[in-house]
């Protein structure tokens, strides 16, 4: 299993028509974003005074992410992307 460092997040991209809250995203929006599930998160980042700021997302969250963000990786037969938390645009609430 992949364990990201810092503010990085491991995502499993959903390969289907994208909807947000039951609304189908327009074709142009689908080209700019993709829906993914958070698989793992790093521990967060440290502020200048040394405090740890935890990620805003957690494993199991569904998120909307920039389409071309991140690095494609494989772990066994599974494909994932690793992105910085800043590339996550929104958490999709049920």
UniProtKB/Swiss-Prot annotation:
Tell me which GO cellular component terms the UniProt record holds: cytoplasm
Q: Where is this protein localized, as stated in its record? A: Cytoplasm
- GO BP term, pick one: chaperone cofactor-dependent protein refolding
| UniProt xrefs under Gene3D superfamilies | GroES chaperonin
The similarity annotation says: Belongs to the GroES chaperonin family.
Q: Which PANTHER family match?
A: 10 KDA HEAT SHOCK PROTEIN, CO-CHAPERONIN GROES
Report the protein name in the record: Co-chaperonin GroES
Cite the source lineage.
Bacteria, Bacillati, Bacillota, Bacilli, Lactobacillales
């Amino acid at each position: 299993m992949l364990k990201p460092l810092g503010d990085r997040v491991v995502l499993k991209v959903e390969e289907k028509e994208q909807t947000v809250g039951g609304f189908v995203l327009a074709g142009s929006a689908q080209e700019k974003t993709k829906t993914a599930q958070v698989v793992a998160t790093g521990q967060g980042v440290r502020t200048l005074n040394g405090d740890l700021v935890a990620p805003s997302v957690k494993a199991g969250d569904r998120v909307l992410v920039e389409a071309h963000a991140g690095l494609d990786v494989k772990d066994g037969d599974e494909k994932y992307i690793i992105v910085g938390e800043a590339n996550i645009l929104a958490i999709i609430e049920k």
